[in-house]
Amino acid sequence: MEWASNKKELEFVICTNLTLLDEKMVKYLKKHKCLISTSLDGPKDLHDTNRPLQNKELDHHAIFEKNLEMIRKIWCDDECASALMTTSRYSLGRFKDIIDEYVRLGFHNIFLRALNPYGFAKQHKDKIAYPVEDFILNFKEGLDYIIELNKKGVFFVEGYAALLLKRILTPFATGFVDLQSPAGVGIAGAIYDYDGSVYVADEGRMMARFKNYYFRLGNVNTDSYQSMFNGEKLHEIIRSACNECLPECAECVFQPYCGADPVRNLSEQGDMVGHRPTNEMCKKNKAIIHYLFELLERKDPEINRIFWSWIK
């Protein structure tokens, strides 16, 4: 980190479950302005169910809460640590509890996130997965609850809705690679693994853990920058990454607000183009965007005020 900072302008974020952090580590992170990203799946019972520690005697949620307080005290800033949640089967029906826990712990936003088809989530989908329709129903209920919190004076943002609203209500991009066309894979970002392998996205790296190396562009020890980022492999991926050209996406009324995801399509449906009628990402995005338009069409001044406060 110290070497890299002397070479170019960089921002660092460390991803951690907080369990192994101590004051010395946190002070080092603060010194180098390295922000902290963690995971919080809800109240203690739900968080510990979703994210069990190998040492069953440890109380994951209690350690999380204690170390979060320590981090904020050292930084003197509540925004130095952000959290992401993942929806498992056990989370369904409990979005209100999850949101309340985020509010209780001093977070001002949440990203109501469905399960992704990669890594251990895909490996254990028989235990933790659910129909996308169930997530959509829970998302709507969660969004309604967040709107009610804001009406009561509690400023709290639903992150995915805020990204979509920025695309709907303004001419500005969000930088969120899942809502880009062409997709951001390999052109808006790349992943460098510990062994020098370069992937178009972190999801490609996770697929490689299970012996699917399709999204590996090369290796920094053997391949040139030009061959990796202007090679036929990336060109082929990007050709399948523009929703203006994809079947059904090209004619979809929500196309300007959505994006393409060739990595997810290959993981879920076996090819980078995908099949929209059975595509879960497509179903989810259509339903959420449609619901946001429903809320906007109510012309409720309070809801409109809340939405604009999220994207300003």
Describe the role of every protein-language-model region.
Residues A201:
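Short acidic/histidine-rich active-site segments
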Residues K30, E69, V103, F229-N230, ...:
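Alpha-helix boundary recognition
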Residues D45-E65, E69, K73-G186, I191, ...:
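Radical SAM enzyme [4Fe-4S]-AdoMet core and its adjacent flexible, acidic
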Residues K8, H32-K33, D77, G106, ...:
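Short loop/turn motifs at secondary-structure junctions
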Residues M1-L46, L53-I63, M70, M85-D97:
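Canonical radical SAM enzyme core domain
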